[in-house]
Amino acid sequence: MPEDNSAAVAQGTDVSFPQDGPNSGATIVRTGGSTFNLTAIGTYQVLFQVSVDEAGQLVLTLNSGAGAVEQPYTVVGRATGTSQIVGMALVTTTVVNTILTVRNPAGEPTALTITPSAGGTEPVSAHLVIMQIA
């Protein structure tokens, strides 16, 4: 399995999720290593997990055509240690083809180092689950 994010994720940069998992249709479409198209207007539940080496935060962004906008109510983080940053949020789109990303917020003081073999010798993957719920 290729490693996720072999380079540090700089401030204001999106986390890559290079491994595809199960897909249940055409409502949520991968458009790049870090971008996902929410093709229908609606509410989506987003769950993400990223193993990192330092304290930091992650935030969801939505881009409905005018540039990616960080969604402040989705910020999650941790203060110390080497472990996972885990987040879950509901996001609502108001236009079709809104692009979703998970980002190291622009105002953060440091880049995030993604841990490629957290807890052992097997490669681990950052996880992202997106489900349309309404």
Model-based region annotation:
Residues 1-134:
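Extracellular jelly-roll beta-sandwich "head" domains, especially the C-terminal globular C1q domain
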